[in-house]
């Protein structure tokens, strides 16, 4: 079932997808490995990260992805450029 994305949230969701993709790559993870660590499907990760796409997803999924990336969910939401302390902070 596809969810309609509020126009006001579209840019935020796109930016969130970019942040997830950027940090995933920085961590050296494939979409498949991130999906496995987060307990979600690879196709969901792919749709969240898809350039120019605004994929709506649950807060539970956001928390699972942020845990898998060893970062606070708030840092993903607020990210446009990650400070060095976030990139280097691995559990």
Where are each of the predicted segments found?
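Short, charged recognition helix plus adjacent turn
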Residues: 2-3, 7, 75-91
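A short, Lys/Arg-rich alpha-helix, primarily the initiator
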Residues: 2-26
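Conserved hydrophobic/aromatic packing and binding residues within compact polymer-binding modules
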Residues: 20, 34-35, 45-48, 76
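Residues within the helices of the helix-turn-helix
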Residues: 21, 32, 63
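Alpha-helical residues within the helix-turn-helix
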Residues: 25, 36, 67
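Short coil turns linking two alpha-helices in DNA-binding domains
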Residues: 30, 41-44, 58, 72
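Recognition helix of helix-turn-helix/homeodomain-like DNA-binding domains
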Residues: 39-55
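Short, basic-rich loop-to-helix N-cap that marks the start of a DNA-contacting helix
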Residues: 52-67
């Amino acid at each position: 079932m596809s969810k309609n994305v509020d126009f006001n949230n579209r840019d935020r969701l796109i930016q969130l997808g970019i942040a997830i993709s950027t940090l995933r790559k920085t961590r050296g993870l494939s979409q498949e490995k991130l999906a496995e660590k987060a307990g979600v499907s690879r196709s969901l990760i792919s749709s969240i990260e898809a350039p120019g796409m605004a994929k709506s997803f649950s807060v539970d999924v956001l928390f699972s992805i942020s845990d898998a990336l060893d970062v606070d969910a708030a840092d993903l939401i607020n990210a446009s450029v990650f400070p060095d302390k976030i990139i280097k902070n691995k559990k």
